[in-house]
Amino acid sequence: MPRRPLLEFEKPLVELEQQIEQIRQLARDSEVDVSQQLQQLESLAARRRQEIFQGLTPAQKIQVARHPQRPSTLDFIQMFCDDWVELHGDRRGNDDQALIGGVGRVGNRAVMLIGHQKGRDTKENVARNFGMAAPGGYRKAMRLMDHADRFRLPILTFIDTPGAYAGLEAEEQGQGEAIAVNLREMFRLRVPVIATVIGEGGSGGALGIGVADRLLMFEHSVYTVASPEACASILWRDAAKAPDAAAALRITGRDLLELGVVDEVLEEPSGGNNWAPLEAGENLRAAIERHLEQLLSLSEQQLREARYSKFRAMGRFLEKTSQDVDKAA
């Protein structure tokens, strides 16, 4: 069994992991019964891992959200979706690999599935542009959503991107316009939309497929208006202050649940989704089916009105009165 890469704050587990691997190797090479010792060490490692992950800072949660072995959109689709058929192209000559989609079946219900897709290694990440979609990707996503709306297919989106691609070519092709159209049109959809932040949800790149009736989020995922590194560079001219920015941005599931941005935070297996992806997939499937059943009981008008009201209720506008100005003076 290959060792999983450990994050910096998981280093206290290194010695335990090495001992576990040594005992497994001993069991493979001899007939010695080491099952009891192995079970004890694995239980100890699980307890320590749980203790570590219960006290993660926002900056550490970002590391978990970006873990290279964290389940991706395609991983989740393969876990709980039957008869998956990927659909390609935006009908303008582009087929962005950073944003994928297609039709599948969850249980007995046909659905449209759309999500950001990162790579597992450098070569695949380059091919998928590290999950940063170009305008063609968002136009492809909107084409698939229109298709779902026409055939009354519920839409499931999976958010996992550091942000929309901000290169010169993307700007020339209308990146801002493509995302803006998606925001407008998603409010008009007549079918249920459930979005899940499975990794990192960055800025407009996440919002481009994130206007949903229900927004779910894994507990070690993050959802933010800008990456902490970018925020620190803008505010303090120092990317090293990213941990401070991460805390100030309130990017965690608990914070966003309190703010009314997300509707449910899904628990992750001890150590994060990368340690037990199948368990994570079952948790996500159960949550999606539960919310989908609730949304399908609403009429088209109720669905759209509730979606609009949900986003209108987010945030507050604070304006100083003349009395406040006088007091400050």
From Swiss-Prot:
The reaction(s) this protein catalyses: N(6)-carboxybiotinyl-L-lysyl-[protein] + acetyl-CoA = N(6)-biotinyl-L-lysyl-[protein] + malonyl-CoA
CoA carboxyltransferase C-terminal domain span: 40-294
Keyword hit for Lipid biosynthesis: yes
GO cellular component: acetyl-CoA carboxylase complex
InterPro entries according to UniProt: Acetyl_CoA_COase_a_su, ClpP/crotonase-like_dom_sf, COA_CT_C
UniProt key word Manganese: no
EC number annotated for this UniProt entry: 2.1.3.15
Compartment(s): Cytoplasm
Record GO biological process: fatty acid biosynthetic process; malonyl-CoA biosynthetic process
PROSITE patterns referenced in this protein's UniProt entry, alphabetically: COA_CT_CTER (PS50989)
Pathway the protein takes part in: Lipid metabolism; malonyl-CoA biosynthesis; malonyl-CoA from acetyl-CoA: step 1/1
Database matches in Pfam families: ACCA
GO molecular function, one term: ATP binding
Record's keyword terms, sorted: ATP-binding, Cytoplasm, Fatty acid biosynthesis, Fatty acid metabolism, Lipid biosynthesis, Lipid metabolism, Nucleotide-binding, Transferase
Function noted in UniProt: Component of the acetyl coenzyme A carboxylase (ACC) complex. First, biotin carboxylase catalyzes the carboxylation of biotin on its carrier protein (BCCP) and then the CO(2) group is transferred by the carboxyltransferase to acetyl-CoA to form malonyl-CoA.
Family affiliation: Belongs to the AccA family.
Subunit structure: Acetyl-CoA carboxylase is a heterohexamer composed of biotin carboxyl carrier protein (AccB), biotin carboxylase (AccC) and two subunits each of ACCase subunit alpha (AccA) and ACCase subunit beta (AccD).
Listed name of the protein: Acetyl-coenzyme A carboxylase carboxyl transferase subunit alpha
Source organism (scientific name): Synechococcus sp. (strain CC9605)
